[in-house]
């Protein structure tokens, strides 16, 4: 019985949190060789962010202004009870 209650509470919490989240998330944690250029030579961090892109000038030879990585939210697993 206690397991069922825990499962139900977990489901309610997941549903509440999922209503706040979208189907996709974006992150700037992109491997340098996988960056897709989003700027132009000499772009500033502010100009880059205004375009909705990520800025990281710590790695030479790769785009500093690049598109964020889109992560698809995984579907929730059903609670077996």
Curated annotation (Swiss-Prot):
P-type domain location: 26-69
PROSITE patterns given in the database record: P_TREFOIL_1, P_TREFOIL_2
Gene Ontology molecular function, alphabetical: growth factor activity
Gene Ontology cellular-component terms listed: extracellular space
Biological process annotations from GO: cell differentiation; cell population proliferation; maintenance of gastrointestinal epithelium; negative regulation of cell population proliferation; response to immobilization stress; response to iron ion; response to peptide hormone
Family annotation (Gene3D superfamilies): Spasmolytic Protein, domain 1
Compartments it resides in: Secreted
Keywords: Disulfide bond, Growth factor, Pyrrolidone carboxylic acid, Secreted, Signal
Main location: secreted
Protein name: Trefoil factor 1
């Amino acid at each position: 019985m206690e397991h069922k209650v825990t499962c139900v509470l977990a489901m309610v919490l997941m549903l509440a949190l999922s209503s706040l989240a979208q189907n996709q998330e974006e992150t700037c944690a992109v491997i340098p060789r996988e960056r897709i250029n989003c700027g132009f030579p000499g772009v500033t961090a502010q100009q880059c962010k205004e375009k909705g892109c990520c800025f990281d000038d710590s790695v030479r030879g790769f785009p500093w202004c690049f598109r964020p990585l889109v992560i698809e939210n995984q579907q929730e697993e059903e609670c077996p009870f």
